[in-house]
A protein has these predicted regions:
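Amphipathic alpha-helical interface elements
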Residues: 4-6, 10-11, 17-27, 34-37, ...
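Hydrophobic positions on the alpha1 helix immediately C-terminal to the Walker A/P-loop
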Residues: 42-43
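AAA+/P-loop NTPase substrate/partner-engagement loops
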Residues: 52-85
Length: 353
């Protein structure tokens, strides 16, 4: 699913392309990624491979944010001993490395992972000064990966900011779930419902979305227990535990919203179809009062409950099959109207029509 996300979801792929394009154009960047960014290692691997194709001269490297001051770390790790000996106190590391022609730093793309708030300021100041001192050579390109919200606003002149959460929205997560659902053993008419439900319940973590979609029917039967089981037994691609803080009650409310959005229009469609089929008989029974005491004068205003009432008083005669269907739709409508969720069997009966 990792390649599906980064290659086939439009905005996720554009996010990937923006990183590559920025690096190829020679600009360092401040890259804001949430802790739950999906398949980070795959993203880094894909960027490294793509940069190698775009600019074979430069090497791509990922490092964990070092404890040392940026310039000191780079001088120690990217300059030979004889070059390091040329460095003299009185000039900054950024000045020296920016002007230095004999360092492998000149042909590097360096991804610096998990940069803290304190270290971010150090690296931004270093890169800004480093860039000012680069003359007659290609500079090193730094990709500073930050995980704290709001830090992306700290970027300095000449350093581009690219933020995951500003590029990826809920629709992208739904699109991923829909694409993933097409590969499950779920019945085709259940797949859009599965995608909608997963994308709403697990919107904070695309990797958890992938796990839930893969469960298919098991997830649809009991979303809460399925997510609980995944959290207890599986981990994210980075080895970290899944984080999910919705309560069962909160999940029920979200499930109801999805069912209202998915099922209610089909109940309304069924009501209109019944009215069209028995319009003449219904018209002869009008005007009639509904359960709220309101007068109904037009067939189009007749609700499912009134249709059920007309059958009960034998004004409207339908087959046993039609009666069972009407009863199912009526019960489903009443449950949703009272903010109660439907069983999967009821959902199936309505969606497969």
């Amino acid at each position: 699913m990792d390649k599906v996300w980064w290659n086939h979801i439009t905005k996720a792929h554009k996010f990937f392309e923006d990183i590559v394009e920025t690096a190829v154009k020679g600009s360092s960047m401040l890259l804001s990624l949430p802790a739950s960014v999906p398949w980070k290692e795959t993203l880094i691997e894909m960027i490294g491979e793509r940069l190698q194709l775009e600019n074979p001269k430069n090497a791509f490297q990922e490092i964990s944010c070092p404890k040392e001051e940026p310039g000191e770390y780079l001088l120690t790790n990217y300059c030979k001993k004889e070059i390091r000996l040329k460095y003299r106190y009185g000039m900054s590391y950024a000045q020296f490395l920016g002007a230095c022609q004999e360092t492998v730093l000149n042909d590097r793309y360096i991804w610096i992972s998990d940069v803290s708030k304190e270290k971010c300021e150090e690296w931004l100041e270093f890169i800004e000064e480093y860039n000012k001192n680069v003359v007659n050579k290609t500079p090193a390109i730094f990709i500073l990966e930050i995980n704290e919200e709001g830090m992306e606003r700290k970027a300095k002149k000449g350093i581009k900011t690219i933020a995951f959460n500003q590029n990826i929205g809920n629709y992208d997560k739904y699109a991923f779930c829909a694409l993933a659902a097409s590969e499950t053993n779920c019945k085709e008419y259940l797949r859009p419902y599965l995608a909608e439900l997963v994308s709403i319940l697990c919107s904070e973590d695309v990797e958890l979305c992938a796990e839930c979609v893969e469960k298919g029917i098991e997830f649809l039967k009991n979303p809460y227990q399925t997510i609980k089981s995944i959290i207890e037994t599986d981990v994210r691609s980075n080895g970290e535990e899944y984080q999910f803080d919705k309560t069962e009650k909160e999940m029920e409310s979200l499930i109801w919203e999805v069912q209202l959005k998915t099922v209610f229009p089909l109940i309304e469609k069924y009501r209109k179809r019944m009215i069209l089929s028995y319009r003449g008989i219904i018209t002869r029974e009008l005007p009639i009062r509904n359960g709220y005491g309101q007068s109904i004068n037009e067939p189009e205003e007749v609700e499912i409950g009134v249709l059920y009432y007309l059958i009960g008083k034998s004004s409207l005669k339908i087959s046993e099959k039609e009666y069972t269907e009407l009863e199912n739709y009526r019960n489903a409508r009443n449950r949703l109207a009272h903010m109660k969720i439907l069983e999967l069997s009821t959902i199936e009966q309505i969606l497969k029509k």
